[in-house]
UniProtKB/Swiss-Prot annotation:
GO terms for biological process: mRNA processing; mRNA transport; nuclear-transcribed mRNA catabolic process, nonsense-mediated decay; regulation of alternative mRNA splicing, via spliceosome; regulation of gene expression; regulation of translation; RNA splicing. InterPro entries: Mago_nashi, Mago_nashi_sf. This is Protein mago nashi homolog. Part of the EJC core complex that contains casc3, eif4a3, magoh and rbm8a. One of its GO terms (cellular component) is exon-exon junction complex. Keywords: Cytoplasm, mRNA processing, mRNA splicing, mRNA transport, Nonsense-mediated mRNA decay, Nucleus, RNA-binding, Translation regulation, Transport. Core component of the splicing-dependent multiprotein exon junction complex (EJC) deposited at splice junctions on mRNAs. The EJC is a dynamic structure consisting of core proteins and several peripheral nuclear and cytoplasmic associated factors that join the complex only transiently either during EJC assembly or during subsequent mRNA metabolism. Gene3D superfamilies: Mago nashi (3.30.1560.10). The gene is magoh. One of its GO terms (molecular function) is RNA binding. Signal peptide: none annotated. It comes from Danio rerio (Zebrafish). It is found in: Nucleus; Nucleus speckle; Cytoplasm. Belongs to the mago nashi family.
Length: 147
């Protein structure tokens, strides 16, 4: 699979008393990682970072996604975005293009109480893995604490 067959974007955020607070990252086909973290808490400023990652990182990302089997899931029964917030995950991998939208998930309790706990659990753990990878890449590359 060539890198031109791959794209990933994740967003989680809400609009509250501190304005629009969100975390967003994307991996583009050319290996560019774009990261944005906006928190207005105590007048924090938005953190925006961009870096190129090696082909091996992109291959590992694809492996994580393939292993998760997220492409077999459907968000039809997942909780819709609400005042607490929203999450979006978009993936292009090979000839598949999938997009998921759901509310923010606080914990596995929220997952287990949903109408599709098995599918939402796949999403929940994949997002945890992706965030961990991105925070590590950003932290190592820029020597900052992403959150």
């Amino acid at each position: 699979m060539s890198t031109s067959d791959f794209y990933l974007r994740y967003y989680v955020g809400h609009k509250g008393k501190f304005g629009h607070e969100f975390l967003e990252f994307e991996f583009r086909p050319d290996g560019k990682l774009r990261y944005a973290n906006n928190s207005n808490y105590k007048n924090d400023v938005m953190i925006r970072k961009e870096a190129y990652v090696h082909k091996s990182v992109m291959e590992e990302l694809k492996r994580i996604i393939d292993d998760s089997e997220i492409t077999k899931e459907d968000d039809a029964l997942w909780p819709p975005p609400d005042r607490v917030g929203r999450q979006e995950l978009e993936i292009v991998i090979g000839d598949e293009h999938i997009s998921f939208t759901t509310s923010k998930i606080g914990s596995l309790i929220d997952v287990n109480q949903s109408k599709d706990p098995e599918g939402l659990r796949v999403f929940y753990y994949l997002v945890q893995d992706l965030k961990c990878l991105v925070f590590s890449l950003i932290g190592l590359h820029f020597k900052i604490k992403p959150i």
